[in-house]
Amino acid sequence: MIVPDQETVYHVISRSVLDGYPFGDEEKDELVKILIKFSKLYFTEVLGFCVMGNHFHLLVRMLPESDFSDDDIKKRYKKFYTDGRQIAEKKVPVYRCKWASLSELVREIKQTFSRYFNKHHNRRGTLWGERFKSLIVEDGQALINCLAYIDLNPLRANIVKCPEHYRWSSIGYHVQTRNKGNFLSFKFGLKDFGVRNRKERLRGYRHYVYEAAALKRSRGKSCRMIDEKIIAKQSETDFKNTRAYKFRYRSRYFSDAGIIGSKAFVARKYKQFKDIFQSKHEKKPKPIKGLEGIYSLKRLSES
């Protein structure tokens, strides 16, 4: 589901068709470079990302094409193509439409990386699987939960002990590079952080992520992803175990739900896209257990 000419946040997931984990450190570095490159061209704010061994996550806010003038298009074109080429006047509307498209953004990212990967590994053929998945995410609580879920991928895979130690993720990029090149947005989703200072915003988000990673099951069995000593060292305050058990294991709600957000947001977006759903019955927002106030378009089974 793509919302045309409206500011919308999407969680994108795309997987390789290759067996195992074909993306090593060098490949992950290259894919991050490509993400940075095209984020400067397209009308987007990158909120989060995570490049894993066989797939990547991207959380982006796509901005409406109507926000950008002809001069904006020409300046972006000139800055991106540094060989001195000029954009033809008749092409300006074409690029305006293209650079506002989530589908075009993801297509260029995947095609550019495929060319690199195939050349680097002396191979031909398809690298990516089915068309990428995209989930519409509401600003606020749904957004920050989705962002934390993305940044905790390396911990769920037992690759690192601290989320910041994984440099191919948004939290790792923020901490290790100090957001080099202003690649990432500091709009983490919760206005109640109550601060404008970027360092304090990042600090608030890191606390939120550590809280999500320090959860316990309601039955008392620990499913902690970060060691208690690490949490104590990183945090100046105690974390309350108030968040759901959604972050410890892969959750389908952050990839297959179609739409997540408040009850009103999900209902409103469903009406907007009602025609594409082949259902005899009216769909209603379903509460996601453990994530208070967050609803899904679909009721999904969880392992």
Specify the residue positions occupied by each region the protein language model found.
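Short catalytic/metal-binding and nucleic-acid-binding patches
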Residues: M1-R203, L215-M225, I231-S303
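Intrinsic disorder/low-complexity flexible regions in very large eukaryotic scaffold/regulatory proteins
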Residues: Y205-Y208
